[in-house]
Swiss-Prot record:
UniProtKB keywords: Plasmid
Gene3D superfamilies tied to this protein: 2.70.98.10
A Pfam family of this chain: Aldose_epim
Name assigned to this protein: Protein LacX, plasmid
The keyword Calcium is assigned to this record: no
Signal sequence extent: none
PANTHER family the record matches: APOSPORY-ASSOCIATED PROTEIN C-RELATED, GLUCOSE-6-PHOSPHATE 1-EPIMERASE
This protein's record includes keyword Iron-sulfur: no
InterPro entries, A to Z: Aldose_1/G6P_1-epimerase (IPR008183), Gal_mutarotase_sf_dom (IPR011013), GH-type_carb-bd (IPR014718), LacX (IPR037481)
TM annotation in the entry: none
Length: 299
């Protein structure tokens, strides 16, 4: 099912499959969101839950509770992105989706939960709020959540990928960890200098010749994608998320994904117990955790 919100600036669409954003068009009909061309990547803006990235061998290990050191299978980016969400509510400027675990999810992730995703259209901005409720009455629930929106790049006919830059809200000097595409794991100790006293990064396909770029040490909580020719662009604000992942495929795809994550793929030096992973969010019984980010069209 497709749902549409519209105001004087934007027309935005969503679908119940994955509970995800599927289109952002301005008043002139220009599409900003990647439209899932399978030649490159058939995704658009999947929701990553209850993990971001990959676990070692896809296994989540849990501390002794009712079962001693139970192990569950959770593949890269979690399981909700391929599931049908329930449409809870639609009004003039917002839509709410929700999902609860089925039997297969509970076999591998040992917590009763409800994930609600609230999209709000306000002027030229779309806010996505993730509301994660722990429905357990006695157990604290560990989770990670992330957004994976991909944007057309170039946005305008006649432009090319290299005409675009990323602009950070702060001057940045940071390194990035080594990644292993075949497993999805990271080596947080083996790092390569990436940004050196700069607020902008010119895009080039060579940036993604190996894998995604994991920015886990950014000061900025905002990044702008902008054409140096037409000025067209958008901004992603991610105050609630400590990490930003930049990604495109290795075959020169006409898109870039700007991904706020609450956690990272498993690193070589960390263990496998989900509750002990760095940056894990823990929700008390019957409590709710909320995280949000914003996409703003700039023209």
């Amino acid at each position: 099912m497709t749902i549409e919100l519209k105001n004087e600036y934007l027309t935005v669409q969503f679908k119940t499959l994955g509970g995800q954003l599927t289109s952002i068009k301005d008043k002139d009909g220009l599409e900003y969101l990647w439209q899932a061309d399978p030649e490159y990547w058939n995704g658009q803006a999947p929701i990553l839950f209850p993990i971001c990235g990959s676990l070692r061998n896809d296994w989540a290990i849990y501390r002794p509770q009712e079962r001693p050191f139970f192990t569950g299978l959770i593949r890269r980016h979690g399981f909700v992105r391929k599931e049908e969400f329930t449409l809870e509510e639609v009004n003039e400027n917002s839509v709410t989706f929700s999902i609860k675990p089925n039997a297969e999810m509970l076999d591998n992730y040992l917590y009763q939960f409800e994930l609600r995703v609230v999209y709000t259209l306000n002027g030229k901005s779309i806010r996505t709020e993730f509301q994660v409720t722990n429905l357990e009455t006695e157990k604290t629930m560990p989770y990670f959540i992330g957004a994976h929106p991909a944007f057309n790049c170039p946005l305008v006919e006649g432009e090319k990928y290299e005409d675009y830059s990323l602009e950070f809200s702060e001057v940045e000097s940071c390194s990035i960890p080594k990644s292993f595409p075949e497993t999805g794991l990271l080596d947080l100790q083996d790092r390569t200098p990436f940004l050196e006293n700069q607020k902008s990064l010119d895009l080039d396909y060579s940036l993604f010749s190996h894998d995604a770029i994991t920015l886990d040490r950014l000061k900025s909580r905002s990044v702008t994608l902008r054409s140096r020719k037409s000025g067209k662009g958008l901004r992603v604000d991610f105050d609630d998320f400590p990490n930003l992942i930049l990604w495109s495929t290795t075959n020169k795809s006409p898109f870039i994904a700007l991904e706020p994550w609450s956690g990272l793929s498993t690193s070589l030096e960390e263990g496998n117990i989900l509750e002990d992973k760095p940056q894990v969010t823990k929700v008390l019984p019957l409590d709710t955790s909320k995280k949000s980010y914003d996409i703003t069209i700039l023209n």
